[in-house]
Amino acid sequence: MKTYYLASAGCPRRAVDSQKIADYLETNNIKYTQDVKKADLIIVSTCAALKSREDLSKTAVTWYQEQKRRDAKVVVAGCLGKINPAVKKEFSEVAFISPREIDALDDMIAAKVPFKDIPDPNQIGSFPLFPDKPERQAKGDRLNKRLDLAYEKEDLFTLRIATGCLGNCSYCAVKFAVGQLESKPLDKIVTEFKSGLDKGFEHFVLIAGDVGCYGVDIGISAVELLRALFAVEGSYKIIIKEFNAQWVVKYFEDLLHIFKQHYEKIDYVVVPVQSASNRILRLMKRPYSIEDVKKYLNIIKAEVPGLQVSTHIMVGFPGETEADFRESIDFIKDYEFPFVDIYAYDDRPNTAASQMAGKVPQDVIDARVHAVKKVQKQILTRLN
């Protein structure tokens, strides 16, 4: 193989994988081409966290099969094959590799430098999903807009601190693809961070399935990671994404101290809460109470007013009543989050939630999404 083409429909974590694959192929003297029809190898990085993203990914795979040369090979990377294994029958002519199986490329390309020897990238390029189909790409952009794709900014330095997570959320199928937590050694992260500063970067983002659970598998914690990073001198800001609520509860006193000391070096923190109904949180298998979350977030807001905190809210989870939904709306209003990432519940194959009774009708889910967006717009108007 001499040339490759790479397209991505993935989240920020899979975007890191895509860049690492590109670095790996270049290291093995396989060169990127902008012309799909000239590529010997076409890699499509997919997403299937939601049905809409699965459909978009499948459309992409079909399109690249149609566009490729007859002798070219298509490899489907990302989460699609593990989240919905049935698609492997639908696309029997392509090879599937999950985020934990990327080293399977070694045999496919007869690699001289194995994938495991390629370091995580810190600067992430853009790999459009449909370069020659702008109307389809626009659809993909709409689907991905809420992901806050800050990692595509040229001035942002990405620090992947871990893969996988420790959660078992009943609605999540991504874990089928990414597996258990695997944290990067602290010294390696600090070394990467310092290298970014040495190169003149001022904006950094921590990437992981759950930043809050960092280090549990290697005997340290996210608190120790943050302390180590903020101990480094320099002019910089760090985005702390996906610091799940249970870890805010667990590490609250230490986090409050860190936030007070270093809030000027924090761009923003994302604390996914998902629901403000304890009943729904239990069904979701989210291991915290909304009372604890409210208590600690309100203390952070009162004592560190300069720290920006955003959240994730899922609406329409099976069994969610209007009263449950109102609890989430009131939570958003009371805290006045400057940004809320809204997820409409979507059945995913083989998840516990997909087997639950009490599915919320789609029109009700759509109305609830609209209601959250309306509240969010009102909050932003007041804050600005």
Predicted regions and their residues:
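Anionic-ligand binding region
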Residues: A353-A357
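Proteins enriched for Cys/Gly/acidic motifs involved in redox and nucleic-acid/cofactor modification
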Residues: M1-D210, E291-A302, R326, D330-D334, ...
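Hydrophobic alpha-helical scaffolding
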Residues: G179-E182, K241, R286, P318, ...
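Conserved SAM/AdoMet-binding glycine-rich loop
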Residues: V74-G78, I83, D198-E322, D334
